């Protein structure tokens, strides 16, 4: 009877009840308040708690308020303290430790650029990007790289102007990545990768613009995703032929491939023209082709903490971990759903996978593998999750693009998406640059949402 009585008390907290909380933060010193516990109403949510912290910081003076988020045991508080206590089965005798941190405000629309066709892939580069730092070059501003269903790779400046177009693929381009401020790699439905030489304003003025320096061949189906490691000069590719390809950013590191001249009256004029242009371009074979998946590979990424390790996602429902030294699969995890994208959150030791089941799974690759080994599941999209991008300066945050026409902003410490950015039509690609979140898709537009300061 005593247990039942206590349980009844816990689940009938009133709006006038109070609970002791202890505020603490890892923010800079001038945002720290006393860690002595104080009583607050259990009805408070993050906005009310933020008002209290601002009042304590300003010592009663009227100053511009700083919005804060609050974490309890590492999880973002998205309910009232009353709901938290009830869910955890705790009484108001509990002292709640509340960590506060600057809130991430909703991104605001910055710009939209029009493209000629559907945009399949987006990548960005900026002065502090790893590709720039590894190249010892200088870059004045962020640049946008896009791959399109019309077979053209384009670079844009932040004013929306097309700086260069790269024509060579004989079908839709499915993935693009910066290698350096003057070099890019693309892949597409024509089964090939292309290394390009580009020239950006203020960078290597002698560079020849728009030149394919090498065609990389080895896949037997469309190549749908790429990842680049700037320090090891490695490229990895995901193919619909169920194979993961390994390449070099330097053509001289790969073996030459001899290709006979194309023949046949059924070849279109466009293909004949492109084939003639390509006849003088060197072709290279992969460093390795890694078999193991039973269905198309849809996403690949390097392990930021160990560049000899990569991860791949596939429609065969699995995430595989590969050792590049031996070119062997060292771990396989089954998810029960077709996987369409993959992203590593290195400082959290997590790998995120987007699925055809509309959710995002978070996996810890250090944990022993077993069926449905999932650390967390993020639910919110209503269609395929096909692309993801990590926040450049916040370890816990990333963005996801979906065929439901939205880009969602996530914090892995919360159960739901932080914000939803709408687009017209399916979204195929997303990148997160310091200037903002850049996405493209079926509406033939590149949209930029700026992060609020």
UniProtKB/Swiss-Prot annotation:
UniProt key word Repeat: yes
Keywords per UniProt: Nucleus, Repeat, Ribosome biogenesis, rRNA processing, WD repeat
Segments of this protein annotated with the region Sufficient for interaction with ERB1 and association with 66S pre-ribosomes: 112-453
Family matches, as InterPro entries: G-protein_beta_WD-40_rep, NLE, WD40/YVTN_repeat-like_dom_sf, WD40_repeat_CS, WD40_repeat_dom_sf, WD40_rpt, WDR12/Ytm1
Keyword Nucleus in record: yes
Pfam families to which the protein is assigned, alphabetical: NLE (PF08154), WD40 (PF00400)
Annotated GO CC locations: nucleoplasm; PeBoW complex; preribosome, large subunit precursor
WD repeats: 128-166, 168-206, 218-257, 292-332, 334-373, 380-420, 422-453
Alphabetical list of PANTHER family matching this protein: RIBOSOME BIOGENESIS PROTEIN WDR12, WD40 REPEAT PROTEIN 12, 37
HAMAP family documented for this protein: WDR12
Assembly description: Component of the NOP7 complex, composed of ERB1, NOP7 and YTM1. The complex is held together by ERB1, which interacts with NOP7 via its N-terminal domain and with YTM1 via a high-affinity interaction between the seven-bladed beta-propeller domains of the 2 proteins. The NOP7 complex associates with the 66S pre-ribosome. Interacts (via UBL domain) with MDN1 (via VWFA/MIDAS domain).
Function: Component of the NOP7 complex, which is required for maturation of the 25S and 5.8S ribosomal RNAs and formation of the 60S ribosome.
Family classification: Belongs to the WD repeat WDR12/YTM1 family.
Name of the protein: Ribosome biogenesis protein YTM1
Name of the gene: YTM1
């Amino acid at each position: 009877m005593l247990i039942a009585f206590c349980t009844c008390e816990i689940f009938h907290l009133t709006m006038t009840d109070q609970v002791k909380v202890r505020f603490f933060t890892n923010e800079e010193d001038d945002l720290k308040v006393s860690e002595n516990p104080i009583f607050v109403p259990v009805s408070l949510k993050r906005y009310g708690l933020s008002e209290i912290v601002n009042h304590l910081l300003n010592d009663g003076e009227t100053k511009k308020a700083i919005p804060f988020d609050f974490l309890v045991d590492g999880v973002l508080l998205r309910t009232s303290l009353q709901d938290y206590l009830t869910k955890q089965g705790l009484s108001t005798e509990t002292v709640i430790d509340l960590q506060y941190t600057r809130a991430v405000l909703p991104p605001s629309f910055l710009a939209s650029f029009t493209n000629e066709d559907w945009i399949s892939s987006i990548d960005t580069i900026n002065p502090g990007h790893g590709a720039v730092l590894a190249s010892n070059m200088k870059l004045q501003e962020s640049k946008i790289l896009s791959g399109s269903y019309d077979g053209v790779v384009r670079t844009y400046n932040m004013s929306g102007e097309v700086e260069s177009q790269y024509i060579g693929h004989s079908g839709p381009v499915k993935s693009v990545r910066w290698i350096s401020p003057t070099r890019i790699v693309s892949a597409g439905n024509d089964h090939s990768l292309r290394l390009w030489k580009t020239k950006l304003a203020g960078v290597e003025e002698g560079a020849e613009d728009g030149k394919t320096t090498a065609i990389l061949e080895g896949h037997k189906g469309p190549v749908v995703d790429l990842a680049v490691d700037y320090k090891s000069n490695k490229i990895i590719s995901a193919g619909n032929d169920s194979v993961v390809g390994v390449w070099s950013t330097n053509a001289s590191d790969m073996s030459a491939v001899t290709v006979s001249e194309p023949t046949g009256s059924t070849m279109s004029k466009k293909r004949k023209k492109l084939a003639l242009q390509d006849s003088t371009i060197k072709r290279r074979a992969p460093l390795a082709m890694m078999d193991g998946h039973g269905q198309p590979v849809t996403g690949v990424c390097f392990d930021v903490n160990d560049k000899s390790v990569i991860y791949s996602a596939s429609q065969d429902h699995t995430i595989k971990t590969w050792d590049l030294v031996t070119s062997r699969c060292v771990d396989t995890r089954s998810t029960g759903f077709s996987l369409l994208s993959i992203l590593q959150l290195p400082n959290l030791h997590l790998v995120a996978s987007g699925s055809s089941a509309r959710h995002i799974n978070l996996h810890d690759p250090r944990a022993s593998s077993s069926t449905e080994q999932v650390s967390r599941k993020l639910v919110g999209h209503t269609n395929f999750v096909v692309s993801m991008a990590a926040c450049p300066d916040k370890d816990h945050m990333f963005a996801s693009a979906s065929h439901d026409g939205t880009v969602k902003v996530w914090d892995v410490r919360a159960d739901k998406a932080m914000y939803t950015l709408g687009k017209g039509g399916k979204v195929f690609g997303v990148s997160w640059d310091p200037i903002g979140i850049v996405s493209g898709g079926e509406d033939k537009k590149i949209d930029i949402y700026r992060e609020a300061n």
